[in-house]
């Protein structure tokens, strides 16, 4: 197939407002050419400006972070369907705004026009611009020059290979061959067939051996294009239907099992153009010499610019003063011109200093905090369970919350937060999406402390509303000096999985029976420090209300609540010998009665074993065709629980399956209780602007003896499959944090640690970064929600595939429970290991990550293992009278 040649590009549009003459510069004048004033010192090299084409991948912002550091200025990110060729021609050739182009990885194949978008035409037309293609971008480079794209001998995702190369400048200062140390991470199912390379392309890198490496270098062994479009009309169609056959599969791609698995092609370059491609992922946290590759590409760019007469006149966009929010917001569709600006611009909020109240705007609040501390108190009264029961456990604990660090082993969590219906500022916010598509808005109901209810339609959705609510709050930092925790009052509740349509997903498969988000505004709360046993009592009031007389009233109400709560706690100290700390006891005398007919109810899994295994196989097929690297498949199990004591169930769950990010939430108006024993943090932002994610990928049951337990722990630690799962999600979370964190700040202090809990061992990693100052807490959540450990990667395509396989909505499961503090911090978990009680029904979600190494039968068993703890607790709470024989059930059940 000959190299493609496209029509002459159209004339450019008018200059964009962000590209002014003051932002342009020409290539530095030759020595001796004169110039402005000066001391004659060396001129620092100009930064390199990169256009980064995003193929809807979940690793693009890892490349963004690397290029920001290497180039000295962040790249401009544009999705592959966001610019037309007219736009590219304008900015690359007329405005001369970019020095080079990088084409990102992504799902699918370059043979499918909508998978690669504008990238193909860029590779065809931009012959005088240095271009680096990564993974899908690499395959696209081969495709436009006639190479065949075929299935790899084996789908490789999250695993490492040693490489050898030919000394090409892209690999300058990088060793080559077996045991050289040049190990790279691979995420791909398709490859360029080496024998199909035209004279235009030169092979520059290959796998050095057939041996695949896991991150810990486990020795476990590893268990074409027949249809290419020949016309421009077919090649550049944008209709998704053009990419599929009647059975919904991608166009035919040859099976490449006959290819040599030993020397898989890992890099190519063009013979005359400065175009390079690498099949592996240099941006991965586990790739060796990844940054060196980007540095070499920068050097290729600068050398090419000096050697090419055409580029001597190239005008390059300077580092200048571009809006940080435009460069680094989660949605970069607002970068270029006013007609492309996203309608929801970020509203920046200036921090309030500790010395004076800010000027008030309409609707603003200035919250002041009062607090008291009781030293070394927790152990004297039998633990945090007794505090919650006495202060908030009455009336079935209606409208209460408890962010419960019920597992504090190994300093995994330190603080618990609890509260109920509070003072004048308390309110409950309940949100339902209007439909299941993006940008649909939804209906919000607000109920205040006095019982008044207001209903509104939110055109821009719940997260936008929450962001504006937080922006309207001012505060005085000195109020919480001395407090060792970040939640000082504010919003506490959950975000359902369906709110993904406000975070880059295009749609939901079905409507959730539970609200899509539900939060309290908590103005009164009690905090427990599990490290030293201290207990804190906190209360908020609105300083701005003093102008109409309400401030003094609020202040007195909150002072009274502080005093009364302190008295109740001290009374508990005096009564400590008589307090029950048995999680099986009833709360405040509430009886626990279940009829025998209810006892006979059983959990029924939404899909049979055969159906679930078929779904796993479908996931493997999608992975093999390059549509995803990892798919987090889930299912739901349900049973009737009409008379279940929800709080009693939670107390039993926290005892049998303690977890650092456990939670209890009750929304009485919705007949909804959430009993969560999650071991996983989704995302946290502390007062030092540090973002942290702690994804879990990899789970195995505890052993019956210490010897068996240690054997199982090591089995998980060295599992190649689980390491691959974990690495993929770590790179995904690095990407999500990279959208909103300062360039160069995203790092991984803990990679693939094994943590042990009461019932399971899990593989956990920690990712951190420093939030950019002009982005809000909600911006950070929108950049990363839903948690990648519950979707897979690439996230957007993976969510679409999962929606097509999962037949019911996830609802609260896979979402997040936690807080948004009034002082602009937050901490959210991943909702797993959770029982949701709603309108007399208990539901539990469970699943697992499907990767190329997955075994369908093992995946089904892992799903059952993850559901075991919560289902066991529900069964125990409902079997005081009747204990059925589970072996005679005709339905798929969990016990």
From Swiss-Prot:
PROSITE patterns cross-referenced by the UniProt entry: GATASE_TYPE_1 (PS51273)
Ranges where the Glutamine amidotransferase type-1 domain occurs: 49-307
Main localisation: plastid
Gene name, Swiss-Prot/TrEMBL: ADCS
Name of the protein this chain belongs to: Probable aminodeoxychorismate synthase, chloroplastic
Provenance organism: Oryza sativa subsp. japonica
EC identifiers of the protein: 2.6.1.85
Gene Ontology molecular-function annotations: 4-amino-4-deoxychorismate synthase activity
Pfam families: Anth_synt_I_N, Chorismate_bind, GATase
Record-stated family: In the C-terminal section; belongs to the anthranilate synthase component I family.
Lineage top rank: taxon: Eukaryota
Classification via NCBIfam families: pabB
InterPro entries (UniProt xref): ADC_synth_comp_1 (IPR005802), ADC_synthase (IPR005801), Anth_synth_I-like (IPR019999), Anth_synth_I_N (IPR006805), Chorismate_C (IPR015890), Class_I_gatase-like (IPR029062), GATASE (IPR017926), TrpG/PapA_dom (IPR006221)
Region annotation Disordered: where it falls in the sequence: 1-45
Keyword list, A-Z: Chloroplast, Folate biosynthesis, Glutamine amidotransferase, Multifunctional enzyme, Plastid, Transferase, Transit peptide
Sequence segments annotated as region (PABB component): 387-875
Record-annotated active site: 135 (nucleophile), 281, 283
BP GO terms, sorted: 4-aminobenzoate biosynthetic process; folic acid biosynthetic process; tetrahydrofolate biosynthetic process
Known role: Bifunctional enzyme that catalyzes the biosynthesis of 4-amino-4-deoxychorismate (ADC) from chorismate and glutamine. In the first step, a glutamine amidotransferase generates ammonia that is channelled between the binding sites of glutamine and chorismate and used along with chorismate in the second step, catalyzed by aminodeoxychorismate synthase, to produce ADC. Required for the synthesis of 4-aminobenzoate (PABA), an important component in tetrahydrofolate biosynthesis. Does not possess ADC lyase activity.
UniProt free text on domains: The PABA component provides the glutamine amidotransferase activity.
Amino acid composition bias (Gly residues), ranges on this chain: 32-42
Native organism taxonomy: Eukaryota, Viridiplantae, Streptophyta, Embryophyta, Tracheophyta
Catalysed transformations (reactions): chorismate + L-glutamine = 4-amino-4-deoxychorismate + L-glutamate
Keyword RNA-binding carried by entry: no
Gene Ontology annotations for the cellular component aspect, listed alphabetically: chloroplast; cytoplasm
Compartments in which it is found: Plastid, Chloroplast
Pathway: Cofactor biosynthesis; tetrahydrofolate biosynthesis; 4-aminobenzoate from chorismate: step 1/2; Antibiotic biosynthesis; candicidin biosynthesis
Organelle targeting sequence: 1-48
